[in-house]
């Protein structure tokens, strides 16, 4: 089975990969290069015919998944699955399982916004792209896009849901709940080991309720200053640049 996680980012997907690695024998990764971000993300979401560079990135992605699979099993929690490389994955594999990992939209928005403009901007869908399910007429600002992404990712999961072998709905608030993982493993038919509790170093502290801080208050003030400005599409580097950094040459 090939298991992927549909999520917006800022949902604990890295932590989930560490739990899979700890409790199962499935090769488990958070984000395996090529990430299929940047120009690859834009190309596959905005054009009917993808470029040679995008095809190459997807070929490398599928090759990596096959190479790192063990007995046909593989797990990756990369949020680009539902945004970008779902098309080649669904074409290449018949046994695709999907976890819908979701966090409430306001916390997701604040977590993205707190990181700031151009920190992960090439991992964000832009609302006016042609293949979006919830497409807007005009481009939006970065902060508007981060909120819109939450709804677009949800719609994309529902759009593909019946084509997955099995799915599982996983609430962010259950990231530290071992019983929830056991239910997930049993639903997917994955052998797993039980432990008394997650190691302290593995616990996701972001699950804990935290008060709104002055940092977030100042962030919202900054966002409000620009909220009504016209949106503008931002540019990306090619995904090929990232692949070269990992020693993959076209």
Regions found by a protein language model. Give the residues of each.
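A glycine- and Lys/Arg-enriched "phosphate-lid" helix/loop adjacent to the NTP-binding pocket
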Residues: 110-149
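PAPS-dependent sulfotransferases, especially Golgi type II membrane carbohydrate sulfotransferases
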Residues: 1, 139-150, 154-169, 173-250
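Glycine-rich phosphate-binding loop used to anchor ATP phosphates in small-molecule kinases
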Residues: 64-90
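PAPS/PAP-binding and catalytic site of the sulfotransferase fold
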Residues: 12-25, 88-93, 113, 168-192
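Hydrophobic/aromatic beta-strand patches that form the interior of the parallel beta-sheet core
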Residues: 3, 27, 97-99, 168-170
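Short aromatic-enriched loop/helix-cap "lid" or pocket-rim segments at secondary-structure transitions
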Residues: 38-44, 89, 110-114, 120-121, ...
């Amino acid at each position: 089975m090939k298991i992927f996680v549909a999520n917006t980012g800022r949902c604990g997907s890295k932590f989930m990969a560490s739990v899979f690695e700890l409790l199962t024998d499935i090769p488990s990764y958070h984000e395996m290069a090529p990430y299929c971000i940047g120009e690859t993300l834009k190309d596959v979401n905005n054009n009917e015919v993808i470029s040679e560079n995008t095809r190459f990135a997807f070929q490398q992605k599928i090759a990596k998944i096959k190479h790192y699979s063990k007995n046909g099993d593989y797990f990756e929690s990369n949020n680009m699955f539902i945004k970008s490389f779902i098309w080649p994955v669904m074409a290449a594999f018949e046994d695709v399982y999907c976890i819908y990992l979701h966090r409430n939209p306001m916390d997701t928005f604040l977590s993205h916004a707190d990181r700031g403009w151009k920190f992960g901007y090439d991992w964000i869908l832009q609302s006016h792209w042609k293949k979006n399910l919830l497409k807007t007429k005009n481009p939006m600002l970065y902060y508007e896009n981060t909120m819109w992404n939450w709804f677009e990712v949800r719609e994309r999961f529902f759009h593909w849901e019946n084509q997955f072998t099995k799915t599982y709905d996983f609430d962010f608030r259950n990231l530290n709940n071992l019983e929830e993982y056991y239910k997930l493993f049993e639903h997917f038919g994955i052998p797993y080991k039980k432990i008394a509790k997650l190691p302290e170093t593995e616990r996701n502290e972001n699950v804990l309720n935290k008060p709104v801080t002055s940092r977030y208050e100042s962030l919202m003030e900054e966002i409000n200053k620009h909220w009504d400005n016209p949106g503008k599409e931002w540019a990306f580097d090619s995904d090929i640049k990232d692949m070269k950094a990992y020693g993959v040459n076209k």
